[in-house]
């Protein structure tokens, strides 16, 4: 096994959950699990979604990203229509997004779109891939510390 994944610094950042309403889902997670909004909501017109990030505390290993549609042509509308929502994707941060994408393609993943800046990550680039087992992963470049 290659040591490249370790060099790329993959770290689980959040679990994305498709919801019809940020408000209702936020209230449910607050009352049921004690989660609270730690960032957002953000409207992201490029992704056609509105998102909020929730956690129990700032030190949580991974957050929950609630994803609601922004507009009628939002890509998550089909999931909401079929399943009513639920787990949508896993997001991993990486030290080198471009190298991570090359590595993912070498592992049989499919790149769904070229990297774009994301509002929720202060303009850091994100990319979407499907794994060979049909899992949707979001990759986000780590913050620059230069």
Where are these regions (language model features)?
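N-terminal beta-strand motif that seeds the catalytic metal site of vicinal oxygen chelate
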Residues: 1-26, 85-92, 143-146
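N-terminal strand-loop-strand beta-hairpin
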Residues: 35-59, 119-121, 130
């Amino acid at each position: 096994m290659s040591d490249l994944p370790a060099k790329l610094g993959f770290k689980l950042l959040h679990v994305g959950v498709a919801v019809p309403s940020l408000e209702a889902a936020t209230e449910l997670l607050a009352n049921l699990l004690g989660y609270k909004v730690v960032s957002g909501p953000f409207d992201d017109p490029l992704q056609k979604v509105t998102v909020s990030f929730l956690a129990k505390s700032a030190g949580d290993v991974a957050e929950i990203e609630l994803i609601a549609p922004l507009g009628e042509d939002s890509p998550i509308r089909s999931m909401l229509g079929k399943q009513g929502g639920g787990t949508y994707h896993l997001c991993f941060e990486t030290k080198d997004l471009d190298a991570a994408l090359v590595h993912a393609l070498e592992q049989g993943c499919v790149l769904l779109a070229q990297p774009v800046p994301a509002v929720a990550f202060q303009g850091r680039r994100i990319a979407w891939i499907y794994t060979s087992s049909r899992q949707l992963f979001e990759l986000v470049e780590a913050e620059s510390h230069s």
